């Protein structure tokens, strides 16, 4: 039976206004819109009155429910029938954890009530199209129609393909019907294999073969034989990549054989809790570094949010499934799309060339895709610290004559680093009889055929197959699985995981054969043991769907009880679905129909399928020289600063958590003005050291339209000039991931791909001492469609994205682009050797040209010398600022450095040649360094020692003030105020934020950027940062116990434990499942801290589901009430823990006036480094800190204080319960965005109880307790940042 319960309003006023504006623009006479959530409960038994009240209370969250009866025509948007939304999975978990076992499932829809003039059926279809994502959702016209969400269908049996009766044609028909993308020779192979077996294949076997042998999974082109211009080539593409490892194997521990590559890290204290006691401690051991970069292009073109989210999620799983289990740590993301054409902000180079109906626009991708990628990383708890963004779409005269080149099929790049124990780097042995396990969520009828779909050019497959290949994301489930993997690797030798892979393209049909085959075994499986929420799925759908957040593992049979215990504690679902066999055979039994849908020798599936040969021709580019007529430097500057590739990326940065883990030493945002211009991302290797890891990206795809090899060389060069900004040492410590995107089969592109791979794999990287131990290829970068009777094609440029990773010697020595105005000199190191080529530059693009000659690596020895010289100068602390020259050229390099330093530039380019335009906009490799005037001679000597004397040019100095002036020989070449340039550079991000977020907030942020008087972040402390008030108490040897409390989805507990540990506590890991099961109580603890993250993925309100699982369980409720009433206890709630504890007011004495915390005014997750002041309050944790003003990490989507009315706010203030407030850079309490990131009244961001024993706050002190993890800090701070005082106060209070 289904019950319907009304929910809170679903859309903020500005979202409704945006919808109305869209309807008006489409000339649809819609007058009013009201939207509210509607909940549907599928019950297996009736609820009594108490249970019903409990369910109603559970589903009461967010803004107050509307009292009026809605008016207008109902359009009910729900998840597609036959799918289960992430919201449903998590809300149902909460209901069960609150004791409501009668609830089979909860689901949620949005009911839109629309009042409109007379609309035709076609116009109503336009309205519904605006309200839902057809890939994920459906529209009903009555609430009762939602019954379809819970419809159950009978299982369907496997289908046989009549090969023996109908011959080869049966396979050809199945290939088209199922969208298998099989080549002719593969059809021949299958015909031969099944004829020899003497039976017909089942659809599931063909599907499994297609996925396992798709280009996506098998990389056929990279393993192919090559004939170019009639000449047989000696090596495959992959062999040329492997050549880099053969030449420079140094420091690589694993390459080409696992889900990620591994290189040597540093010996540090890894911090985690003991399995038996729950006590956190440091474990001194090597923390080796793993690296992986994936792409998820096809799904992102179809449905950008889930496409980008599952792209990030899949890459995170690759990291976790490395070796015998590893820990993902920090991420990067990238996008290449066609022109944005932002409404009202269209640029002169942006022409509309049309697109296929089935894919979304570049603007849609960049509105939704980055949010999906960021949301997954945020909820999983991985900081996103690096990225790139390129737009390109133009009709150009390239290798193949005049044609359309651009990114209608986008690049969505997701990558990152992690850490792994030395003894877990290599996979283990799979014993015969080992249990084969699926860890993670249930099978669902989604994401079918993603591997094969990704391997086709967009436009070749049926639209319904595109629809089927989109996946959905549930990062909170992946977090639970990762917690299990963490518990396993933390056991060291007792790790129960023998072998692990992630489930990606092809689902279990690819993952399980790969698992057993890699382990040298076969496998027998039971289909019906696979967890599934949809009983009506066919065997093919159960085995081959790409439901996310799953891993496959081999676990020794005698270790299964331990594994079961770990999974139950973390509430991570798992199923034992088979066991490993001696015989290399794959069998899948179906208990329901008592038949064998799969019964195959493994070598039929993964054996010697036909090898591809590429027989291709070379084409030379025909580019025309850059036409200069009408180009002025002033106009060029404004255009280039508006090009999204160059323009400010804040709209892509602040949506992503950049502080979680407490180990982020360098994020994108630089300096007191938080400008997103960092050269590279840097993390600390642990919470107790200055060793670290660095990541950087290099990419110059448009250059490939003129010169394939130069484009590839520049990508490597740019990655190197970016990562050089931190202290790495020997260049052999740097390892690269190469992600290759090409339109295979397009005239000239295959030969160009070979040329590019050869340039990097055979020549440049071996000469530099660089290794490429990991990478990925995507070979179908083309879209086709029809405009009227005309056939259209958009082909991407050959695109190589290089991600560089390295161990860091000392993270404190990372150099940023932030200029200083002390007596200084700016030096350009020009690795272009004066060539100043303008082909395929940002300048050429904004004037709709390509040019003829591009930049290139002009001298490999000088590039190596450059890296070594910069490393020497970094180690000697001789550099004040550093920024590489890249998109936009020297002009942009200097401008970004000035923005970061909030200063002026007095530049002189006389020594850079007579062509001023080329000197300023050429994108040859190089960098600008700032040095003290007194050090200039010594610095130039170091550069000369490394063979760079002829590359060094003095180009002026940074000056205080607002002027940005470039001269040559006494003549002004360009002059403008830095503030004006800053505003131009910011306009793209402003327009994107206005479209996507609350436009009022976007306007406030943009306005703030034009304030030259802004002093930036600054610090005023009322206490001595170096005083350790806990020291006398630590000296006693007593270590009070603090319960570090987490719920499923919490992700900030480790850094929280480390902060308390440093202050003299024994930090104990306490999961809510421990309390609910009675394994642990709170009676033995002196302090309790509820940590940040996304408990239950923030469904049912941020922290509210967590709180209700306490309030609705009598024993646990009493446990918390007793703790809060016990004198001499302390409690802290941070972020999600703050939201949770604000909902426990009925249990916490003196908290009656606490507010609720609701959706930010911006309607967006906000990750900021914000200034707060400590106010006078009873809070025991903030004693001695009153009056201090200091920055702190902020990361939340629901942090806005909501009070009942003005009287409630006045009472909260008059009782003195406000503990922290947001202030602007002038020290004034603020409600203005983004200084106040959530819009809380009076800047309130922390409150306390009347006794001061319980304090809750939205910002994260535990992420910045070390100075090194602050995005910016005064230079005189030592190891501990000022927020360490909170934790020491806690220790002092407990005596």
From Swiss-Prot:
Its main location: cytoplasm. It comes from Escherichia coli O6:K15:H31 (strain 536 / UPEC). CDD domains: GATase1_FGAR_AT, PurL_repeat1. ATP binds at residues 307-318, 678, 886. Residues 1042-1295 form the Glutamine amidotransferase type-1 domain. One of its GO terms (biological process) is 'de novo' IMP biosynthetic process. It is an enzyme of class 6 (ligase). The gene is purL. SMART domains: GATase_5 (SM01211). In the N-terminal section; belongs to the FGAMS family. PANTHER family: PHOSPHORIBOSYLFORMYLGLYCINAMIDINE SYNTHASE (PTHR10099:SF1). InterPro entries: Class_I_gatase-like, FGAR-AT_N, FGAR-AT_PurM_N-like, PurL_large, PurL_linker, PurM-like_C_dom, PurM-like_C_sf, PurM-like_N_sf. This is Phosphoribosylformylglycinamidine synthase.
